[in-house]
Amino acid sequence: MIGELLRRGFEVQLSDRKEHLLLVQTGGSAPKPVQVKTVHSTPWYVRRASFAGSAVDQVTVYVLLEVERGIRSTRFFVVKNSDLAAQFRQPQTSNPIGFIDAKSVEQYEDNWEILR
């Protein structure tokens, strides 16, 4: 993920916070926290808290690592959490974990401009 961001002209560093965040910036802009979620097959499992409070304005990159007919490909879906809040699905339990499916993120594929 870091290599992909560097290739696209972003400056990247790992956050020193407990969460696995990247800090991304371009030019002289202030660093933006970016959460990265990676799977080999969908859905992505996420916490309800990602869609509430200050996290709602954060950007998440959903990474799908696919292998089809022996060929590896990586797809990136770059989206603001608030844009996916209505797509978050959660079982009828007290578990704070739910999921985001592939159809929910399709329109955000390679949406790198949101980080600029």
Ranges and model annotations:
Residues 1-18, 24-116:
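Mixed-charge (Asp/Glu-Lys/Arg
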